[in-house]
Amino acid sequence: MSKHSTSALTMRDALYEAPGPKTKRKIMVGTAVSAVVVACILLAILGRFYATGQLDPRYWTFFLEWSTWRFLLQGFAGTVRVALTAGAISLVLGMLLMLGRVSKIKPLSAACRVVIDFFRGVPSLLLIYFFFLVVPQYGIKMSSFWMLTLPVALAASGVLAEVFRAGVNAVPRGQVEAAMSIGLSPAKTMRKIVLPQAVRYVIPSLISQLVVVVKDTTVAYVVSYPDLMQNARVLITSYDALVSVYFTIALIYILINYAINKA
């Protein structure tokens, strides 16, 4: 076992002591009680759905038709297009904003800090309304795809810029000094030494932010973009089946986000 792994194991043991028999019994009891409470809540919800007729077959049988799933798959494809495009744009823009934020040029650093704080603070829904209602007033025509994708990407870029900056700050200062001492320029040091390590450090945070991007696409109804949620709203209107459709769509989104986290 390497010295690094031994040190990490020692630190983990110091922070998280293995539970003893008494603690294990408490955990088992707590788990059992929680399971019973959750089961009771689910039964109460199902009972309420049954009492109001939401479990009637007419609200569920249309999911046995291929046309329903084809329509949902079309919306799923729209969601994937927006999520991938917005994710790619936000990664590039977030990296550029981070580089500007850590720049030694003070005006550039200050400007990037303002932009980052703005995009982090403004809700993505407000940005979508801006692109949908305000931007066209200035003669700029956009498709519903870009009216949704750009705001989602901008909102995510502010968060990703800070994620990247945290990764850069996590790189040991000694490595930067060593690179500078052998004659590497600050730009080459950032590109060859700092960024590769910083990106590895923040991969879990990048995945989490991609999940947020997928969730942000659910407001596509604002711009009438045919994503998964928008097509679900059409099904609800067509079949008057709010509970069954939203339940199915929720499961689909859970599977999408689970797949992203496991990627």
PLM regions: where:
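Transmembrane alpha-helices and adjacent helix-loop boundaries
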Residues: S2-A263
